[in-house]
């Protein structure tokens, strides 16, 4: 095959199959450029690589072969386990692809720039998606289930009545605030007139858009609701002290308009892990004439 390439000319050589390289390859190939893409590893993905159970077994074997000797360790005891023995029953059932170890887990909002690009580029034809069924967050010493809809909030056992009312009122306030300034990437029509139990919170949000989000939340909610809003609804770290109320509302609105698009939750995940994104882009590039080399 190498001889077949001797007389070929390429416009671009791309090294690696990370998400950025794969997306660039797909774009250039669709633009009629001649691409050759090389990855020194056996599989696609780079930093977004994921292993099924069999891949993980082989990866662990390679690690064991390259493990440093005990004599170099002063205060660490190496414990070797037979990975193959532990995984044997699962491997024999030929369902090893149902178990994935993702190096860099990623999910998509059902309505977002990324999901729109995947559909428009037809890369989505090469990916199978599942909806993320449940999301939990840690509060004190318990895992709490995050409700996604009005009905789920009402029946939640993790929130008391006052917390439910406050959370619903906050969600409706954000929707009402952002409905008048819908992002161009949103294709979801949301009701323009939303009834609020109390306009006070809506006015507080509207009049404090430049305030630090963490300060605003701590003023109006207890720690449980504050954590839920920051971690899940706005997809932020609890230590993010710089995010404003306006930025928080933008993030929450993106979350809310993705609910009930494909399922009750707003998130989509590739069935076989994040490397599916890079593989889809690579396949799209290959369909348009690119040549790939892996180890």
Language model features with spans:
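Alpha-helical interaction elements in eukaryotic regulators
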Residues: 20-24, 52, 110-114, 213, ...
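Glycine-rich FAD pyrophosphate-binding loop
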Residues: 13-15, 29-54, 64-75
């Amino acid at each position: 095959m190498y001889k077949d390439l001797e007389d070929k000319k390429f416009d671009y050589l791309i090294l690696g199959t990370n998400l950025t390289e794969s997306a660039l390859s797909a774009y250039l190939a669709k633009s009629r450029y001649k691409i050759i893409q090389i990855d020194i590893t056996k599989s696609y993905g780079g930093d977004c690589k994921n292993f099924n159970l069999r891949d993980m077994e082989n990866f662990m074997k390679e690690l064991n072969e390259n493990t440093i000797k005990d004599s170099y360790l002063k205060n660490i005891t190496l414990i070797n386990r037979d990975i193959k023995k532990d995984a044997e029953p699962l491997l024999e059932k030929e369902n090893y692809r149902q178990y994935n170890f993702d190096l860099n887990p990623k999910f998509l909002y059902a309505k977002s720039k990324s999901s729109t690009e995947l559909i428009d580029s037809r890369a989505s034809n090469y990916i199978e998606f599942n909806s993320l069924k449940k999301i939990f967050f840690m509060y004190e010493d318990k895992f709490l289930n995050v409700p996604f809809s009005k009905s789920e909030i009402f029946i939640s056992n993790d929130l008391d009545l006052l917390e439910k009312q406050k959370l619903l009122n906050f969600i409706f306030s954000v929707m009402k605030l952002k409905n008048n300034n819908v992002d161009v990437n949103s294709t979801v029509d949301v009701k323009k007139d939303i009834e609020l139990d109390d306009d006070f919170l809506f006015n507080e949000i509207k009049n404090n858009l430049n305030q630090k989000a963490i300060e605003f939340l701590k003023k109006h909610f207890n720690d449980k609701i504050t954590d839920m809003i920051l971690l899940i609804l706005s997809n932020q770290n609890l230590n993010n002290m710089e995010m404003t109320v306006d930025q928080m509302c933008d993030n929450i609105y993106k979350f809310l308009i993705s609910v009930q698009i494909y399922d009750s939750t707003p998130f989509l995940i590739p069935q076989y892990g994040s490397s599916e994104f890079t593989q889809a882009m690579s396949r799209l590039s290959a369909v348009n004439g690119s040549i790939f080399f892996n180890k």
